Amino acid sequence: MGYEDALRKNVLPVDKELIKICDNYTEALRLTPELLSLPNRPDAFFAVNDETAIGVLNVVKAKGLRIPDEVSICGFTNNSLAEVSDPLLTSVDQHGYELGAIAMRLLIERLNGVRDGDRIVSKIIKTNLVVRQSTR
């Protein structure tokens, strides 16, 4: 897992209690209160997608914590929800349109016999952080 690898690389402890499998808004509503009640409450959340991050954001606000002063929140996808949340959500833009266009081009090439179907194709699509109001 990238998160754990980054911690280990920087000689930081991996606290499994802070890692939750949560990929949707409803699960974020269920799991975030548990994390916020820990003795050493997290001061930041990174979510697998923007919908999950919005769930975290809503729980944090409902608990009376100030975003981003007390808790920072970052999503991943940079979809339209990030631009209408309150506060506006910081998110990693994964360039989904470009990803889809490349995938479709590769599929069409394979279907047309231009590409060997047994060959694995690896493409790197760079992401970028879109900083808004939910992080400091």
Question: What is the meaning of each model-derived region?
Answer:
Residues 1-136:
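Bacterial carbohydrate/catabolite-sensing allosteric modules
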